[in-house]
A protein has these predicted regions:
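Solvent-exposed soluble domains appended to multi-pass membrane proteins
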Residues: 1-130
Length: 130
């Protein structure tokens, strides 16, 4: 999932997101299931720890996608001078250097874009506090 987009033909600055399969095998899995939700790669930590019934509070950007409190599925990624945010309403991509929306589908009332900006700011705040 780093360095190239998958499946082939997917771009990292538009409405398409990488679909990265993940297989979990062994004791952490209580029963077979397929999870088809919008989620982020950072959610892996909280989800796995949740299955093991371990605390995941040290991962503030990770959510347990199998938990009952996972009610607002989202995906976010940033690279260089842009970020992309997806939720059930659609996807918004923002070019930070150009200070403009570079992709939006469907048109957004600004809420989706603001959520993406808030996540990016929170990540910067977290990094600067370390």
């Amino acid at each position: 999932d780093h360095g190239f987009c998958y499946p082939q033909g997917t771009t990292d600055r538009g409405g398409e997101f990488s679909h990265i399969p993940m297989l979990w095998l062994g004791g952490a899995i209580k029963q077979p299931l397929e999870v088809d939700k919008i989620m982020n790669h950072a959610d892996l930590a909280a989800t796995l720890l949740g299955q093991l019934e371990l605390d995941h509070s040290m991962f503030p950007f990770s959510r347990n996608v199998l938990g009952s409190d996972y009610v607002y599925p989202t995906a976010f990624y940033s690279s260089g001078n842009y970020f992309t945010f997806r939720d059930s309403t659609g996807v918004s991509a923002y070019d930070i250097r150009a200070n403009c929306v570079s992709y939006e589908e469907p048109a957004d009332n600004g809420e989706r874009l603001n959520r993406g900006k808030a996540i990016l700011q929170s990540a910067y705040d977290d990094l600067s506090a370390r």
